[in-house]
Amino acid sequence: MGSAIHGDEAAFGSLPQGGGGPGGSSIQVRILPYLELGPLYNSINHGVSILDKSNVTSTDVTNSVFHCPPDPLAGSHNPSYAGCVGSGDYRNLGVLGGEKTLRLADIRDGLAATVAASEYLVGGAGVVDRLRLVYTPDDFTTGPAPASADAFAARRGDLVGEVPELGGDTQYYKGFYWALGVENITLYNHIITHNKPKGDRHT
């Protein structure tokens, strides 16, 4: 996915933007030509919403290139990879954030320390696994910093009153639909930024 993002930037002069594609399409849609999936890209009607009925045939496909084989919940429409739109407590500071257009040359602190996309575990209806849930920056702006990943998940559960929230929603959950450019589906935000202690949610 990283090499495809680089290919797209070389062709268009800017990085693909999360949710900024035609019709709200995802980064995954924009980089299809650089994953040897040009015919699929060309079959999509980019002049209308990605959810329009004219795009059902094109987007109702299984793209194994976006799936992590060991993850039993990945597959069909569910991607294992998401673009980074932000870091810390703000969602649009990432290189693929939808409020700006960036070139690789604009990343002045080095590409080696910059995340454009990441693998993550797909959620699902009724899934309560702490590694598959959706977390938001708003959940961690008050109170003591969680000391561990389990405490992090427990804090999330305490705040929403139930652990699943979007993870238990029957329609939208983490990695729900590969073609839709929406945060928590094909986009994500780093809550804990690079080189931060795991228990520190402050940025």
Predicted segments, located by residue:
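Internal low-complexity, small-residue/proline-rich segments
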Residues: 1-203
